[in-house]
């Protein structure tokens, strides 16, 4: 699934141990606007994909590719987007030659 949306806040970087190895993770939230409505998308990227998010800033337009995964915690179901690949979409500046 491909989604283009804006970054709500600065990404959060952390790590955890799995099978005796440290796994890097970045979590971030995107907002996709639909007419008068909004959808917030909780995203997570792991391993070497973490590096890409270090240049992201609040408000950036981000393209993500991956899949949604439901997770249960404290009796609630959370929907997270697992990122397979992603990048910042650069804004095109109109340059007028004089």
Question: What residue spans do the PLM features occupy?
Answer:
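Single-stranded nucleic acid-binding surfaces, predominantly the OB-fold ssDNA-binding core
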Residues: 1-98
């Amino acid at each position: 699934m491909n989604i283009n949306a804006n970054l709500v806040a600065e990404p959060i970087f952390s790590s955890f141990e799995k099978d005796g190895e440290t796994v890097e993770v970045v979590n971030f939230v995107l907002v996709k606007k639909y007419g008068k409505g909004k959808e917030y998308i909780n995203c997570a990227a792991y391993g070497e994909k973490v590096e890409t998010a270090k240049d992201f800033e609040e408000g950036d337009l981000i393209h993500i590719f991956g899949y949604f995964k439901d997770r249960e915690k404290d009796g609630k179901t959370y929907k997270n987007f697992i990122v397979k690949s992603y990048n910042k979409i650069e804004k095109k500046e109109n340059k007028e030659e004089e």
